A protein has these predicted regions:
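N-terminal leader/linker segments that precede catalytic domains of diphosphate-processing enzymes
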Residues: 1-80, 85-102, 106-139, 148, ...
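NUDIX/MutT-family hydrolases
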Residues: 143-181
């Protein structure tokens, strides 16, 4: 377990991730995608109901999350991490960094990559690789309006809540749907699955797999 969230460091996270045994999933006829699980600073807060705002810049560690643009054909308005399909010849790391630059205007080099978490196969036909990235303060983010409705800095302590995760059975699913509460709302898998595994294995030192958790029905297409 990392002794204090406030004491998170690049070296410490890189070491913890180096000891993580990643479970990869063969894509078969599915499309490869990657997301950036980007660690940044809380800044002025998450800009969400039920979460505090800070008049002065807060350097406590946070995750960088987005809400997808309402104009998108798939998964409009859903919580997400910067990410998308791999271009021909790209690695998941390259794709995650490219998508972060395109979606939120944050350009980082390969040295910011700390490691990977487990792949997750979605019902919509993707195998997603989460790439953990150290984003620094990331003070000048700009949402690409064609892809991102809003950008949020969610303090890591929010994901340590006692009521997380939320597990529910739904008809037609063999395994529970996993959600993570945030403020007065919640985030669904696959994004919630990546957050939960990062919390359990990397922050708390509890080996946890998440690929079996299902998504809510609205995310099946």
């Amino acid at each position: 377990m990392i002794e204090s969230i406030a004491s998170l460091s690049v070296a410490g996270l890189r070491e913890r991730l180096a000891g993580f045994s990643v479970q990869a999933i063969d894509a078969d006829d599915r499309q490869r995608a990657a997301v950036a699980l980007a660690l940044t600073e809380t800044g002025h807060g998450a800009d969400l109901a039920g979460m505090p705002a800070f008049p002065e810049w807060n350097t406590a560690p946070a995750l960088l999350l987005t809400r997808r643009a309402l104009t998108l054909r798939q998964h409009a308005g859903q919580w997400a991490m910067p990410g998308g399909r791999l271009d021909n010849g790209e690695s998941p790391e390259q794709a995650a960094l490219r998508e972060m630059s395109e979606e939120v205007g944050l350009s980082l080099d390969s040295g910011s990559v700390l490691g990977r978490l487990d792949d997750y196969a979605t019902r919509s036909g993707f195998v997603i690789t989460p790439v953990v990235v150290w984003a620094g303060a990331a003070r000048d983010l700009v949402a690409n309006p064609g892809e991102v409705a809003s950008i949020h800095r969610i303090a890591l302590t929010e994901f340590l809540r006692d009521d997380a995760p939320i597990l529910n059975q739904v008809r037609g699913a063999a395994h529970p749907v996993l959600r993570m509460p945030v403020g007065n709302a919640w985030i669904a898998a696959p994004t919630a699955a990546f957050i939960y595994q990062f919390r359990e294995w990397i922050l708390l030192g509890r080996p946890t797999r998440v690929a079996h958790f299902d998504q809510p029905v609205f995310a099946w297409k």
